[in-house]
């Protein structure tokens, strides 16, 4: 679509730089990528657009009409193109007059002329009509045949040329004077550009020398000056927070001074702050006063405290974060920590922040833990050597001396740091509605839970239930081993009590348990179960206890204590010692009756019935022995099975009657 970005950038390089500077002075920042996209669309649908660019408002209105027609025909115009077109069109409106036909290629000569020195010599009436720090020279000519493009660069890019050392030196802004349209002194206007000469030569041409200024609402208004980094300002004491750094001032030497307090500028400044958390101002700003104001000569300058409330967007983001993620989610803790350490928050700020973000029940918890933390901190302040002069009223922002915002804004850095630490600890103890804080004894690692997740849960519970930091650290290190699963305990056991000083115990435990529960660890456990060999520094052992001696590693039938007792009993009962080798397994000095080996010395399996006698045939029970019927002709041969059953069926049947008994001869 259209030309490539590189061609567009090289073709309109000068015009793009001018447009960016123009928009920047109006308080709008547009990326080069979006501008290149805009000119790609213009190249496609507006081929008449001049290569040197144009400042004519009619041309930009025509561009808008043709882009709308292209959109009606089905062509896709990105939204950023419409936004950039509207911004450029709005920025060019203040520069137009009734006879506006401004082209960048038609602007010869330098448009930056310092009028301060010459205008001071004129009468007060003339100087009041001058509001020219920098005056615009003629920007209208009928042809471009005699255009000097070196001068053209000075016209459009004075700031760039100054940085490169090619342009004229720019003089700083002078006193703000009423806006006027007085002509330039004749000595400062080039001869070729003097309007009187050109008008006489060609009266049909419009005036070529005039001054133009944007409305006061669009003029750049610098921020209030602040004497940060004053040479006589003492450095911040060690161990305390440094003085707040001043915001970076934008240098705009070519913009004329404008009236302060413009309502539009206040809206623009407010909109800039919204959506950019890094631009949030400190609620309490410290500004050192110059010598002579509140301090005598030779004394360090005093510091003036100025309070500024939170922005509505920041409070809204805090409320949405607490509602969506919870007050103690990682996101909210990180956001709160950045706000607390990036701002100089007084007790009033903490109360407003908590009230606007938390539920009533959560705010009650926060206030309760805040008061408890203040009581503990006051005790530590009194016990310090020397004692710290910070009382409970100051840390809570109450009482006759610390109840107002102006009084709290004068708090020392040490008190601000103590309030920050107390409120952060109180915020961490807030519980979600309907949830209870479990005891650290009940936090145990499941068989499939990763060890870092278990330690994170343990630390979270300990942080909410144990206030003392040293006690919390000891409890976490102890429970990290005691409440871990057996696999992690076996990996941590060699490190327990042997972690070198200066190293974090929990970090070493996490390193030792890295990989437990994974595929590689499961394969190692399976190999240990099959082979029983040492793998990865761990030995496969039997985990049960012997019912005879109570020791771990063998069963009762293999208990060495029981075997020794049996050998002693056998020796005392038989009166003789066991043979040299067992006749059964041939690999131990014990009796064969006590041999429990399953393999002989050659590795062949042994039968468990070796010591028993030969099995005997079952005895017949009944009145008469059953003799099989053998038909004639089959003596000495195996009769057929059918004939055997036939013979059995011919036997007398005895139901419930007793069998006949032989008569007893007397």
Curated annotation (Swiss-Prot):
GO BP terms: viral translational frameshifting
Family indicated by similarity: Belongs to the beta type-B retroviral Gag protein family. HERV class-II K(HML-2) gag subfamily.
Where along the chain is composition biased (Low complexity)? 624-640
Q: Where in the cell is it found?
A: Cell membrane
Q: Output compositional bias ranges, type Pro residues.
A: 232-247
> Does Methyltransferase count among this protein's keywords?
no
Q: How is it modified after translation?
A: Myristoylation is essential for retroviral assembly. Alteration of the glycine residue leads to a block in the budding of particles and an accumulation of Gag inside the cell. Specific enzymatic cleavages may yield mature proteins.
Looking at the record, which segments are called Disordered?
165-189, 217-264, 598-641
The Gene Ontology terms for molecular function here are: nucleic acid binding; structural molecule activity; zinc ion binding
One matching Pfam family is Gag_p24
Q: Which parts of this protein are zinc fingers (CCHC-type)?
A: 544-561, 580-597
Instruction: List lipidated residues, N-myristoyl glycine.
Output: 2
Q: SUPFAM superfamilies annotated for this entry?
A: Retroviral matrix proteins (SSF47836), Retrovirus capsid dimerization domain-like (SSF47353), Retrovirus capsid protein, N-terminal core domain (SSF47943), Retrovirus zinc finger-like domains (SSF57756)
PANTHER family in the record: ENDOGENOUS RETROVIRUS GROUP K MEMBER 24 GAG POLYPROTEIN-RELATED
Q: Which UniProt keywords apply?
A: Cell membrane, ERV, Lipoprotein, Membrane, Metal-binding, Myristate, Repeat, Transposable element, Zinc, Zinc-finger
Q: Which portions of the chain have biased composition (kind: Polar residues)?
A: 604-622
InterPro entries attached here? B_retro_matrix (IPR003322), B_retro_matrix_sf (IPR038124), Gag_p24_C (IPR045345), Primate_lentivir_Gag_pol-like (IPR050195), Retrov_capsid_C (IPR008916), Retrov_capsid_N (IPR008919), Retrovr_matrix (IPR010999), Znf_CCHC (IPR001878)
Keyword match Plastid = no
Comment block on domains: HERV-K Gag polyprotein contains regions homologous to the matrix (MA), capsid (CA) and nucleocapsid (NC) proteins from infectious retroviruses. Evidence suggests that HERV-K(HML-2) Gag polyprotein can be cleaved into mature MA, CA and NC under certain circumstances. However, the exact boundaries as well as the size of processed Gag proteins have not been precisely determined yet.
Q: What is this protein called?
A: Endogenous retrovirus group K member 21 Gag polyprotein
Q: How does it sit in the membrane?
A: Lipid-anchor
């Amino acid at each position: 679509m259209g030309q490539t970005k590189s061609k567009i950038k090289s073709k309109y390089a000068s015009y793009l730089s001018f447009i960016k500077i123009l928009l920047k002075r109006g308080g709008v920042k547009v990326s080069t990528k979006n501008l290149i996209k805009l000119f790609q669309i213009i190249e496609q649908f507006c081929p008449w657009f001049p290569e040197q660019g144009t400042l004519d408002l009619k041309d930009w209105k025509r561009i808008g009409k043709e882009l709308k027609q292209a959109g009606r025909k089905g062509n896709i115009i990105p939204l950023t193109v419409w936004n950039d077109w509207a911004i450029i069109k709005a920025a060019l409106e203040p520069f137009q007059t009734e006879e506006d036909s401004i082209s960048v290629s038609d602007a010869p000569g330098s448009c930056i002329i310092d009028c301060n020195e010459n205008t001071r010599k004129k009468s007060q009436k003339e100087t009041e009509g001058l509001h020219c720090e920098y005056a615009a020279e003629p920007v209208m000519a009928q042809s471009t045949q005699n255009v000097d493009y070196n001068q053209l660069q000075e016209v459009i890019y004075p700031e760039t040329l100054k940085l490169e050392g090619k342009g004229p030196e720019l003089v700083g802004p002078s006193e703000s004077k009423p806006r006027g349209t007085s002509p330039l002194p004749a000595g400062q206007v080039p001869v070729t550009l003097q309007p009187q000469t050109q008008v006489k030569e060609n009266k049909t041409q419009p005036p070529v020398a005039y001054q133009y200024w944007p409305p006061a609402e669009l003029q750049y208004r610098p921020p209030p000056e602040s004497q940060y980094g004053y040479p006589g300002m003492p450095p911040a004491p060690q161990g305390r927070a440094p003085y707040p750094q001043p915001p970076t001032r934008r240098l705009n030497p070519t913009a004329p001074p404008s009236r302060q307090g413009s309502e539009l500028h206040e809206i623009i400044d407010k909109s800039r702050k919204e959506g950019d958390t890094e631009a949030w101002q400190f609620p309490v700003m410290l500004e050192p006063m110059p010598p002579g104001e509140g301090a005598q000569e030779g004394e360090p300058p005093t510091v003036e405290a100025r309070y500024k409330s939170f922005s509505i967007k920041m409070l809204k983001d805090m409320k949405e974060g607490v509602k969506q993620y919870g007050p103690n989610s990682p996101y909210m803790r990180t956001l709160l920590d950045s706000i607390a350490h990036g701002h100089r928050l007084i007790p009033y700020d903490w109360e407003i922040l908590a009230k606007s973000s938390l539920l009533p029940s959560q705010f009650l918890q926060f206030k309760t833990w805040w008061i408890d933390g203040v009581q503990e901190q006051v005790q530590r302040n009194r016990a310090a050597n020397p004692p710290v002069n910070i009382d409970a009223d100051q840390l809570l922002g109450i009482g006759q001396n610390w109840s107002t915002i102006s009084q709290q804004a004068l708090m020392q850095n040490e008190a601000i740091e103590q309030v920050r630490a107390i409120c952060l600890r109180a915020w961490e103890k807030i519980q979600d509605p309907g949830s209870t804080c479990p005891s650290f004894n009940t936090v145990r690692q499941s068989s499939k839970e990763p060890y870092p997740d278990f330690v994170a849960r343990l630390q979270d519970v300990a942080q909410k239930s144990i206030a003392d930091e040293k006690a919390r650290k000891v409890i976490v290190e102890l429970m990290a081993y005691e409440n871990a699963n057996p696999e992690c305990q076996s990996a941590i056991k060699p490190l327990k009590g042997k972690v070198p000083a200066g190293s974090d115990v929990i970090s070493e435990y996490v390193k030792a348990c890295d990989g437990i529960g994974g595929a590689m660890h499961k394969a190692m456990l399976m190999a240990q179960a099959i082979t029983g060999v040492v793998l990865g520094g761990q030995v496969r052992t039997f985990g049960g206890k012997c019912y005879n001696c109570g020791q771990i590693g063998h069963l009762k039938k293999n208990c060495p204590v029981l075997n020794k007792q049996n050998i002693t009993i056998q020796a005392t009962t038989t009166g003789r010692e066991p043979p040299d080798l067992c006749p059964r397994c041939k690999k131990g000095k014990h009796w064969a009756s006590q041999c429990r080996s399953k393999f002989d010395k050659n590795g062949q399996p042994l039968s468990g019935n070796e010591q028993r006698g030969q099995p005997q045939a079952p005895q017949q029970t009944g009145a008469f022995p059953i003799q099989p019927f053998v038909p004639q002709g089959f003596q000495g041969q195996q009769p057929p099975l059918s004939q055997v059953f036939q013979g059995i069926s011919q036997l007398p049947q005895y139901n419930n009657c007793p069998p006949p008994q032989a008569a007893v001869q007397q």
